[in-house]
Amino acid sequence: HVTGVQTCALPICDKLESLFPVIDADCSDSGSFDAVLEFMLMSGRSLQESVMMMIPEAWQSDVNMDQQKRDFYEFNSAIMEPWDGPASIVFSDGHYIGAVLDRNGLRPSRYYVTKDDKVIMASEVGVVHVDPSNVLLKGRLQPGKMFLIDFEQGRLIPDEELKRDISAKRPYGDWLAEQKVTLADIAKPDNILSLEDADGEDALLRRKQAF
């Protein structure tokens, strides 16, 4: 906030104005996403971590999800609202190139990996002619999944591997256990009666007021 920056007495606050606005008012959806992703990269996060934060999987109800990955998503959900698109995003920082589909999965993203080390991704197959005999691998991005190529390693990194590595870098589960506060954790003031505590006409009045 501009007012907060103007009244800040710390030396670092003199430099904060150069960061804003992160998103220009007339920016498109794609431009806004690009601006926030670049901002997160400049803050020290890796490309993969930033994209995982911005376009998470549907983790809340997935009982089969690895606990470390669930902890990563839950912790970062307090920092970043999900960009649910619908969107299929392609990204690169010169060291990696990848793509991710938002968790609703409404944008088709199909890919070919050829035997002569080419990768082709588009909304539909056939955008670029590929000899079937030259196809090493083909598939489509699944909702919330990431497709990532590491230029330095020269390989395609599976979604499960890259997210496992990112999720294990910090003790997100410990942080949640220590710092997460839910409504059930907040003590009820002694002078406030809940609907369950009231009876008779008092209960009826409280229900009317609540309605």
Can you describe what each PLM-predicted range is?
Residues 26-31, 126-128, 181-189:
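Low-complexity, flexible helical/coil segments
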Residues 1-8:
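Single conserved hydrophobic/aromatic residue that forms the stacking wall/gate
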Residues 11-45:
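Glycine-rich phosphate-binding loop plus the immediately following alpha-helix
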Residues 54, 64-67, 77, 100-102, ...:
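Extended, highly charged accessory segments
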Residues 9, 36-39, 43-150, 163-165, ...:
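Conserved mixed alpha/beta core segments that line enzyme active sites in large multi-domain catalysts
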